[in-house]
Amino acid sequence: MSEQLIQAVNKQVANWTVMYVKLHNYHWYVKGKDFFTLHEKFEELYNETATYIDDLAERLLALNGKPIATMKESLETASVKEAAGNETAEQMVQSVYDDFTVIAEELKNGMDLADEVGDETTGDMLLAIHQNIEKHNWMLKAYLG
């Protein structure tokens, strides 16, 4: 198995681990007229994120990789950053949109690496995540106007 592919998948474990905590922060601290809508949306997203973390980590183990499993490693490795803690509702949505945009590009890179080594299973897993976040980003962009 390609070490580059293992690193790319591990980066996604780190990204989604940071997103999981960030989305909880947003779920708990969102305020304003869109509270009910965003509170539910952030919960939906962190539940989905939990599935990604587990699926990606287990795939790494199946490939004899070692998934990142601490917040310290996740924060050091991830392309996305944790929540600042004082965002407005609109800033929260913009941040998730921006993070998903970064992750989508990295997923494409991972799909290319999987294709190069003939790992259809990993490629399909990354594609499924990519499809989901593209749909979420369409909705988040519509919310932002």
From Swiss-Prot:
InterPro entries: DPS_DNA-bd, DPS_DNA-bd_CS, Ferritin-like, Ferritin-like_SF, Ferritin_DPS_dom
Induction (UniProt): By heat shock, salt stress, oxidative stress, glucose limitation and oxygen limitation.
Family designation: Belongs to the Dps family.
Protein name per UniProt: General stress protein 20U
Annotated Pfam families: Ferritin
Alphabetical list of CDD domains matching this protein: DPS
Sorted UniProt keywords: Stress response
GO molecular function, one term: oxidoreductase activity, acting on metal ions
